[in-house]
């Protein structure tokens, strides 16, 4: 395969071979100014100062002074859904809470009702449009959850759509089974029967078709208890599905501790945690993942990411792209929110959506930084001075080109 040279790069960001960055290391700044990168066989083969760039390379992309960064790694999304929920948005503007809307049949149950009426082909078509949109904004790896089916067949339908996206997209995709997203209306008076369905029917069928990498549970006030979460995750583990958890979004639910107990790859949300949860995370290998776009959209507290990093934790940041609480998969916007509302530095935010986001999907050995042998998922910006400027001047598209698996995907 012909090699590709990216030349005249103003600054290369994210140069390192680490697989996860914690605490003060999240401020690490591996930069080359006036550099080049060579891609061969869809992977980064070399990089360095421009005056050391090889000659006579077959394909040449001129960065024209722009920045080059690893493509974003978004480790928490729900992009397979049937319909938007802007009606609930206007209800919240009038004073209704997320919990009140959910209790009245809105929220997740609203999405489930619409998804159950939508064909697999239509779900694939709409999810493909969303995936293409976020790839164009620089996302090259993504985790996608089920959870709007809430019946065995509809959960399987969602996961088959995710598998089809994986087969037809240049993005690296991880799939998560989230049957324990909410208790369906038909089981409101017998929640144990639904949990039995998850354990005895859904999980075996999901695993039998090889449709998921992970099993997630919404462990929070009004959804699933810690005891229920523990049972579900233990059952999933027997079938080879690793744990992830929605935890501590609405209350101090105990979800962090139950995630750690079940060796969760990540615990996500964390808007309502304190010293106890932070200390527990420090003693574990579970990755805390924060979702600033959700806090912004629901107007709820932001996770204490600053305190977490200052305590020595590494964090991932993800969009939580979904129709109800975060209808955006735009990572550049997320980065501005994280800096402004969580008081993170641009470098910390950058590592949260690159190497640490990759780690939360167990792919940081091949993605999330710029280093020889890693997959060439890259963003080339327009001619701007720095990463700081990229985040500071929010609302403007600073991206010029997106390269996924070594191929030019999108040019502005």
Each model region followed by its residue ranges:
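Active-site-adjacent C-terminal substructures of enzyme catalytic domains
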Residues: 242, 252-369, 381-388, 394, ...
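N-terminal metal-binding scaffold of metallo-dependent hydrolase/deaminase domains
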Residues: 1-53
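Short peripheral tails and domain-boundary helices/loops at the edges of structured domains
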Residues: 397-412
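Divalent metal-coordination and catalytic microenvironments
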Residues: 9, 37, 42, 65, ...
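Conserved beta-strand scaffold positions in the cores of enzyme catalytic domains, especially
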Residues: 5, 11, 58-62, 175, ...
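Metal-coordinating catalytic core of metallo-dependent amide/deamination hydrolases
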Residues: 111-126, 132, 140-254
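Metal-associated gating/positioning segment near the N- to mid-region
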Residues: 63-126
């Amino acid at each position: 395969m012909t090699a590709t040279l990216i030349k005249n790069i103003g600054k290369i960001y994210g140069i390192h071979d680490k697989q996860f960055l914690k605490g003060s290391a999240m401020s690490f700044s591996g930069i080359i100014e006036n550099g080049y990168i060579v891609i061969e066989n869809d992977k980064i083969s070399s990089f360095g100062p421009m005056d050391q760039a090889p000659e006579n390379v077959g394909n040449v992309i001129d960065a024209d002074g722009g920045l080059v960064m690893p493509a974003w790694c978004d480790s928490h999304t729900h992009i397979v859904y049937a319909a938007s929920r802007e009606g609930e948005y206007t209800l919240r503007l009038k004073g209704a809470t997320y919990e009140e809307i959910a209790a009245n049949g809105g929220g997740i149950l609203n999405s489930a009702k619409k998804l159950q009426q939508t064909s697999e082909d239509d779900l694939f078509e709409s999810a493909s449009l969303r995936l293409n949109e976020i790839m164009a904004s620089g996302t090259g790896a993504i985790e996608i959850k089920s959870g709007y089916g809430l019946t065995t067949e509809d959960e399987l339908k969602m996961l088959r759509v995710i598998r089809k996206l994986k087969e037809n997209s240049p993005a690296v995709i991880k799939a998560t089974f989230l049957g324990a997203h909410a208790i369906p209306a038909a089981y409101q008076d017998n929640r144990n029967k639904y949990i039995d369905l998850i354990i005895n029917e859904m999980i075996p069928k999901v695993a039998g078709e090889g449709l998921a990498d992970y099993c997630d549970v919404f462990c929070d006030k009004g959804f699933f208890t810690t005891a229920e979460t523990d049972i579900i995750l233990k059952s999933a583990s027997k079938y080879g599905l690793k744990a992830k958890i929605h935890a501590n979004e609405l209350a101090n639910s105990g979800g962090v501790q139950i995630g750690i107990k079940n060796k969760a790859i990540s615990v996500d949300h964390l808007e309502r945690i304190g010293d106890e949860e932070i200390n527990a995370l420090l003693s574990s290998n579970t990755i805390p993942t924060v979702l600033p776009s959700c806090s912004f959209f629901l107007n709820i507290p932001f996770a204490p990411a600053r305190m977490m990093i200052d305590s020595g934790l590494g964090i991932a940041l993800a969009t939580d792209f979904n129709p109800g609480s975060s209808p955006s998969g735009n990572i550049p916007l997320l980065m501005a929110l994280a800096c402004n509302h969580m008081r993170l530095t641009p470098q910390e935010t950058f590592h949260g959506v690159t190497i640490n986001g990759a780690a939360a999907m167990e792919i940081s050995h091949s993605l999330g930084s710029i280093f020889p042998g890693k997959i060439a998922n890259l963003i080339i910006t327009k001619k701007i001075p720095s990463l700081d400027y990229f985040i500071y001047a929010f609302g403007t598209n600073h991206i010029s080109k997106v390269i996924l698996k070594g191929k030019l995907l999108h040019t502005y």
